[in-house]
Amino acid sequence: MLRMRALWLALVLLILSIPAVSAQITVTRDLPDSAKVGDEITVTLALTIGSEKPAGAIIEESIPDGASYISSSPEATVSEGKLKWAFYGEQLKDMTLQYTVKVEKAGKLEFSGTVKTLLGNENIGGDSELEVSEKSAEQPKGTPGFEAFVAVAVIGSIALLRRKH
């Protein structure tokens, strides 16, 4: 009987501690509204400390297929297509992390990441998808003033032909 009460008490305490993970720290991702193949885009991760500051946190973000890593601030550890930042003690505070990637193909880029503390893991919230369009072909540019010269020459030729008739 005493054992059963202890199990119930442990279960209740476990359930009550679950919201504590999200109360500790949240990370929200912000993506640009649009991108084209070849663009360099900046992804912003806003880190907010909750009412109970954890001893430390590891933020891990996956670089999506179709994008290549360029840089980050503060500098992240990059390995196997993932960025990692580790903060503890006084380093851990409300802050903004940013990284830049080059978009290499059209389609949907899917971003994902986690924040890890001693109490558990939580997915990074906010934007998670970015639709990338093909780079539009640039219109060839003529010699400045050439079009005007041709137009004047054609109009002048027409005027001369009419005068002769």
UniProtKB/Swiss-Prot annotation:
One GO cellular component, as annotated: plasma membrane
Keywords: Cell membrane, Membrane, Transmembrane, Transmembrane helix
Protein location: Cell membrane
Principal subcellular localization: membrane
TM region(s), chain numbering: 7-27, 141-161
Bilayer disposition of the protein: Multi-pass membrane protein
Protein name per the record: Uncharacterized protein AF_1949
Organism encoding this protein: Archaeoglobus fulgidus (strain ATCC 49558 / DSM 4304 / JCM 9628 / NBRC 100126 / VC-16)
